[in-house]
């Protein structure tokens, strides 16, 4: 109900100005206009909205809040635009003004959304380019469960921002540069030289094993260390043999990553660390020009303001090592500079969002401060870190295999689909239903992957969460199967003869369950705006779960297909809008829906 809320806010402000003209004029002069403090009602019995601004005026006006609220209400009642929108306001408690939208206006809002693909969610008036940096696996390493959160949280946020009308650049900042390639190329030259000049000579699993061997040699063998560093210098210098080997390794990993992305329906533009190599010297020059660089023990650093180590001294962000090499902070600064830079030499972004684990919070806080002090973040632009917690096993410890290894993402997704298939076959057997193998595979694949995505997204991303196949695949509770089944239930209404597409005349509602569903449906636009601002997909999940519950109560307690001729069209309209809203909301989470389960 964002449109109604905006209209009410303007009407309340005008009423306050008329009720207290002197105070309003003084407030405007101080650039602090009177605020009605309009918010959704905390409980259904309080109406639709609640205005709490009278309490804040009590001290400056030296009047009781209820007296102030009474004066504001009198002005509202004298405004025909307000009385056309709301029933008579009620003053509650110390001076809260409770507002209830007229039923016919709520019904009109539902009617408007029935013909609106955006379901009442307005596109932003001034779309600003947004960069969302997410997923970001490392070359020559398999994607593991830790990449799941960044990938699906980042994808969901990108979908919401795109839906709101922002041009979004989805970036995959893969780890495709650095010492690890010197190690790996040196090792492969000795044990599997074909992998360095022949495509697909080894698969990603082999590369991972070779990487572990190379890392052990690098840690234990000084001669191997020296050769590896020489290989890095060759790579940085553009040696054609080294570059070809590097390119083949990247391509092999890229193909494996893409299989995961295709499976999860993730769209990404790869732009690895290597992309920013040409811009690293300019970062140093820019920091020098801004007089931020300090030489400390041979390294070039920027000391942070307001951040001290255990010794009480300011912590440094090292941007160039004593040997002249660069590090992650330098690359991240180059990326920030490029992303905010004007086109065609930059992305021209006005909001840059990094979706990584919470363990990198201090790193990004330091890098962001350096970029801000260097003047690389345009005025009014936003640079944000979206941190997330760990994926834990049901024992509360970091999720591992029985052998103690990191869980491969591919294996986790396979198991989710296998378990969904087992559950489906068991249910079909209990119901004595016969379905084609194609149907079973499609439903199991959809439900399994949806369950994994939703279980993650429904948690507050800032906290750790416990991974449980049993919980996420359950048909009850705040799960993907529960929501998918709500959509299936509505599709069943159409199959049983309810035409969800035809609506003639005005909508009419009389039952409390109908009005509860109407009000829940009309919250969708506010929830999307909240996710766009707060970058918390779990708010959307909570809304969809509540909507499903409200719909199920409506459907269980109010006749739909057996309703009388007068009530039937309006109830079918509620079913249709519920299905559309669930499909749209789940789509923004990257979850497709089903007509049958």
From Swiss-Prot:
Catalytic activity annotation: tRNA(Arg) + L-arginine + ATP = L-arginyl-tRNA(Arg) + AMP + diphosphate
Pfam families for this protein: Arg_tRNA_synt_N, DALR_1, tRNA-synt_1d
Any single GO BP term: arginyl-tRNA aminoacylation
SMART domains the record matches: Arg_tRNA_synt_N (SM01016), DALR_1 (SM00836)
GO molecular function per UniProt: arginine-tRNA ligase activity; ATP binding
Key words of the record: Aminoacyl-tRNA synthetase, ATP-binding, Cytoplasm, Ligase, Nucleotide-binding, Protein biosynthesis
Gene Ontology terms: cellular component: cytoplasm
Biased composition range(s): Low complexity: 23-32
Family to which this protein belongs: Belongs to the class-I aminoacyl-tRNA synthetase family.
HAMAP family: Arg_tRNA_synth
Protein name from the UniProt record: Arginine--tRNA ligase
Lineage: Bacteria, Bacillati, Cyanobacteriota, Cyanophyceae, Synechococcales
Chain's gene name: argS
